[in-house]
């Protein structure tokens, strides 16, 4: 996988404390970055797919139906890194940085997370943390309304996410579709092993990896039409559960989208 830092697309990075050599960084802290990746898949059917499409899409085929995902984006809020002896309160802060509950907040949100469908590992957020042990990332999958100024500003920039927490665009058997999910849900992802941040240590990176290959898939491996998973449709709960189970978090200091511990690097 390649590494990419989409600063222009992910404006939240610019609102944080800065890069690791920023002289304004709080003394005695260490930068921890949050990156995002999509689990790599090997499409079953490639012969009718052009190379430019492959560069920006995920393609799935069950032998009967073909699903092409051109865009997958989620809205997150209250993104916090929790210490091993802390208990994050997702509603406890509206500002990035350290919280009184011993947690470090990447972003209060709402934050638009565009999933990289081209094999890249995208750096999306950064926070400066105190030395210690960190065991969990917490965040909300956030259905946005305009209850406060931050949400109103988000919707002005992203009007297609009004009342939406997940948006997927692509084709189903060659026909364009737009899938949306209207779910508010809290997520807790544990680090195994926990992240050890040493005093004066180098920048660390955590990668949030999503496996989207099963988002629109039944237990028997057959794909489902995204139109049947829209709010109120018969496959709504199936796809909602698949998305909820697709998150994985791990230490990835070499930014290759793979678990450092399993590679023998951690």
Predicted regions located by residue number:
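Residue-level signal for mature regions of secreted extracellular proteins and peptides
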Residues: 12-13, 96
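A short, solvent-exposed, low-complexity linear motif enriched for acidic/polar residues
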Residues: 20-266
